[in-house]
UniProtKB/Swiss-Prot annotation:
Pfam families: SurE. Nucleotidase that shows phosphatase activity on nucleoside 5'-monophosphates. The keyword ATP-binding does not apply. The gene is surE. GO terms for cellular component: cytoplasm. Its cofactor is a divalent metal cation. One of its GO terms (molecular function) is 5'-nucleotidase activity. It comes from Jannaschia sp. (strain CCS1). Transmembrane segments: none annotated. Binds 1 divalent metal cation per subunit. A divalent metal cation binds at D8, D9, S43, N96. This is 5'-nucleotidase SurE. Keywords: Cytoplasm, Hydrolase, Metal-binding, Nucleotide-binding. It is found in: Cytoplasm. Belongs to the SurE nucleotidase family.
Length: 263
């Protein structure tokens, strides 16, 4: 199997090393793992692409490239430049430092890479490691992802219709709980949640000595449940969450009532 990996934390992020080890296990003997990751951190850029300027790319070593762009740019670079003659069988994004559960999904460059891979017609899985009191002080906070990542991916790949034919192909969002590997309770297939109290994203203003105003993004505590049988809730409870997703944003539950109202 040929696997392309990327992330949003950058080419030198520890989570990318974790993902490379996982991908090497999945690829198997004779398989290939290729890396095209951002040259600089791209957290929070979502599914953006750099269409207003070129993306510079450099080779960092065998099958290892850094692109000066977003995670979605890296997927495009991997598919249409680095591996243009030998496309990958699977694209993996992560392992993100921090969760991409609930509303975080919508901001995530890790998820953005998986979205672009799916739009390009390839199977893709995003992986993120929740941070919390149960793992932040471990020697390896990515311990849960390291120990369970390959098993989760194999289970997804083996699921019936995992990447069925559809104009908007499925991709998967995997979040590992903020606990030691031995304390992981299992795997749960759940929906995307919304944290109690809503998103904590906001802005804080600072004034520079020259009178210019600077606005800084602010966040909120992450160990907050996201509703019953949803990602952040089961993560906090010690379970790995797996959420099937599509980039189709249509609110189908409202489509017929809108048709009735305006047509």
């Amino acid at each position: 199997m040929r696997i392309l990996i990327t992330n949003d934390d950058g080419i030198n992020a520890p989570g990318l090393d974790v993902l490379h080890t996982i991908a090497t296990d999945i690829a198997g003997p004779g398989g290939e793992v290729w890396t095209v990751a951002p040259a600089f951190e791209q957290s929070g850029v979502g599914h953006c692409i750099s269409y207003t300027h070129p993306t510079m790319i450099s080779e960092f070593g065998p099958r290892r490239f850094a692109a000066e762009g977003s995670p979605a740019d890296c997927v495009l670079a991997g598919l249409h430049d680095v591996l243009k003659d030998t496309p990958p069988d699977l694209i993996l994004s992560g392992v993100n430092k921090g969760n991409n559960s609930a509303e975080n999904t919508l901001y995530s460059g890790t998820i953005g890479a998986a979205i672009e891979a799916a739009i390009q017609g390839l199977p893709s899985i995003a992986l993120s490691q929740y941070y919390g009191p149960g793992n932040i002080s471990l020697d390896n906070p990515f311990e849960a992802a390291s120990a369970h990542g390959a098993d989760v991916i194999r289970k997804i790949l083996a699921a019936p219709g995992a990447f069925e034919s559809h104009p908007y192909k499925l991709f998967y969002n995997v979040n590992f709980p903020p606990v030691a590997a031995a304390d992981v309770k299992g795997i749960r297939a759940v929906g995307q949640g919304f944290r109690e109290g809503g998103t904590g994203m906001g802005m804080r203003a600072d004034m520079a000595p020259n009178g210019r105003k600077f606005l800084w993004i602010t966040g909120s505590p992450q160990n907050v449940p996201s509703g019953a049988d949803t990602d952040a809730t089961v993560n906090i409870d010690g379970y790995i969450s797996v959420t099937p997703m599509r980039a189709d944003l249509t609110a189908y539950d409202q489509l017929q009532s809108l048709k009735d109202a305006i047509e």
